[in-house]
Amino acid sequence: MASKKPMTKKATATKSASKKKTAEAVAQPVEKVVVEEEMVEVIDTTTKECARTSLLPGDLINIVITELVGTFILTLVALSTGYFNFAPFYVGLTLTVMVLAIGAVSGSHINPAVTFGLWSMRKLKTALVPFYWAAQFLGAMSAVVLLNVLSNNTFSLSFDSFMSFSWGIFAIELVGAAVFMFGLAAVLSRQEVKPSGKAVGIGMSLTIGLLVAGTLLAPVQNGAYKAARGGVQSGTIDQNKQHALPHELYVSGATLNPAVALAATEKTDSQLKNGAAAPAEGEKNYSRLSLEVITATLIGAALGGNLFLLVNYRSKAEKLAN
């Protein structure tokens, strides 16, 4: 057997260099893969961060459309059932159906006061508020246009009462909106409740808010009626005013919703005095949208929502302390 010749220094150096090149060749693809993975991770992180910090969502058009349609339907139901005893239940049931139908898309606010309340609770981005409000008021206006067309242009609205302000009406709208928003915030906080259960809870919250406001309206109107009767007897009532009687007497119920208030109307003199079903010829239909309704519902919604946050926070703090 032939013996192996010892390797020369030159051969040894050549072999070492070859091994080094091979190791570098293997290391380069590995390093390249690591760098590419890091770049992909950075890009993904940046994309997610941009999506999270984006002011407007990608489905903004869907939100606007669903809010418009939802407010349109709610307004029609509120107007058609406004003079029925069970109107709060009909309106609450309608809201329940709307939450089930469009809640997953826009949250089914269909009420500028709810949008403002959620914004005050930091549950809604500021940039979205104008879009919600625009869609909601457009929905209510669409209901007015439809009713005007169907009634042969007799359902025209007058906004001469927009600047009117009654502390009594302000109070009932504020309390009703606060009760409604308190219940809504409580329902939304219950993560274990199914969507159908939340829809029922939100609808019932609106029903209870309307019932509470309606209960408060009765003493307000009684006080206004007594004051008006005393004014008639003493001759201090101005018969040439826009309303011959106190403003509170022309209101048939609370709205708790500025968009619905835009389409809702006050009673006319003939309806109030003679119990007529429709306004007399030449009488104006005064819109319920006024400073008292707008300010009361917005403030009430903010108070109700944030009051629940306060109560819920204190409750959790006490549980942790115990």
PLM region spans:
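Membrane-interface helix-loop junctions and terminal tails of multi-pass membrane proteins
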Residues: 2-322
